[in-house]
Amino acid sequence: MANIRERATDALLDCGIPMNQSGFLYILDAMELFTENGAPITNMRVVYEMIARKRKHNVSEIMENIKYSIIFGNSNCRTGAWVRYFGFDFVPKTNGNYLAFMWERLREEDARNKNKQR
């Protein structure tokens, strides 16, 4: 997938999640892990542990900061952008649901853009 970090940054900003939140960075890390894996990692504990090792933070910090960023974006975003990237219209889901849906949407958009260029 074309530069997932850049595409996810644009999506998070579009959803009203500010870059100065720790969760913003951790969500980008999760998107990179999913891309390296070729699919979302279903055990979020593994994702949190990998990010915690990379960032030298504890797992609960990673989980809570991602959750806070998602909640913040959910309450400050235009509905259309939120549904586009997270797929759920203000219905509480798990971090894993949100991140997997976002990664899948970015992957689908990337595939559509490649098809348009042909």
Where do the language-model regions lie?
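Short alpha-helical "recognition helix" segments of helix-turn-helix
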Residues: V47, I51-A52
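C-terminal engagement/docking regions of AAA+ P-loop ATPases
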Residues: K54-R55, E64-K67, I71, S75-R118
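Histone-fold modules and their flanking histone-like tails across chromatin and transcription assemblies
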Residues: M1-V46, K93-R118
